[in-house]
């Protein structure tokens, strides 16, 4: 977990939900927003499944207030095949994710953020 007041760490990752944000998303593409929520989620996690609909509603409500949201999945597809980029794209489409859903294949971004489990949320102001 990052220290309170830390700046958001830079990233550039492929987007499995390209209708929202394009084929890849970086921190720089989100800079025009006054606040940023980085959410580490995945398809198979029962906690993520439980909050999924509420999270989508939350994002729809707060993006109108200037909150940018990006979700990142950093699971290894060998151990979690339901979290593959193809399955992520299906999930984003099926549940109408209104945010980029990024794939962190190397887990470098998750490690840099010290994301420990899913869901794990990091909120930043500018």
Q: Predicted regions span which residues?
A:
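Chalcogenol-based redox active-site neighborhoods
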Residues: 1-126
